[in-house]
Curated annotation (Swiss-Prot):
Catalytic activity: S-ubiquitinyl-[E1 ubiquitin-activating enzyme]-L-cysteine + [E2 ubiquitin-conjugating enzyme]-L-cysteine = [E1 ubiquitin-activating enzyme]-L-cysteine + S-ubiquitinyl-[E2 ubiquitin-conjugating enzyme]-L-cysteine
One Gene Ontology term, aspect cellular component: nucleus
UniProt-recorded name of the protein: Ubiquitin-conjugating enzyme E2Q-like protein 1
Domain UBC core residues, every copy: 1-154
Keyword Lyase recorded: no
Source species of the chain: Mus musculus (Mouse)
Length: 161
């Protein structure tokens, strides 16, 4: 897959990829960098968190349909990360997806959304140790897409970048 080769060539080590069970359609992606002026970056430093681990599962018709993307660890609060590690981003839906998007671009958008949404590493006793589940993420994502299809997606003001 060309996407995998492109990521291997990145010079800034923004992300790194490992195949899950050598499956080209199932990736674990390590997000190594978020905005260094953000509270999330500060959380990462304080908790010795080197990266945010995500899972991307690609459909057979990728790049014409989006991958399913979810956070695996650490457990995050806010930042558009919902139950199960589901991610609330229109570009991850069939309606919002474009076959021109690259995994790198999606990951950069996700990193920006985490910061814009005031994402934080969960430090609440008990809750921070509970792992995200794929089943819960899929159900949450399906529900949020249904809600947004009914009520629309909020477009941030131009002043927000």
């Amino acid at each position: 897959m060309k996407e995998l080769q492109d990521i291997a060539r990145l010079s800034d080590r923004f992300i790194s990829v490992e195949l899950v069970n050598e499956n080209l359609f199932d990736w674990n992606v390590k997000l190594h960098q978020v905005d260094k002026d953000s509270v999330l970056w500060q959380d990462m430093k304080e908790t010795n968190t080197e990266f945010i681990l995500l899972n991307l599962t690609f459909p057979d018709n990728f790049p014409f349909s989006p991958p399913f993307m979810r956070v695996l660890s650490p457990r995050l609060e806010n930042g558009y990360v919902l139950d199960g590690g589901a991610i609330c981003m229109e570009l991850l839906t069939p309606r919002g997806w474009s076959s021109a998007y690259t995994v790198e671009a999606v990951m950069r958008q996700f990193a920006a959304s985490l910061v814009k949404g005031q994402g934080r590493i969960c430090r609440k006793a008990g809750k921070s140790k509970k792992s995200f589940s794929r089943k819960e993420a899929e159900a949450t994502f399906k529900s949020l897409v249904k809600t947004h299809e009914k009520y629309g997606w909020v477009t941030p003001p131009v002043s927000d970048g």
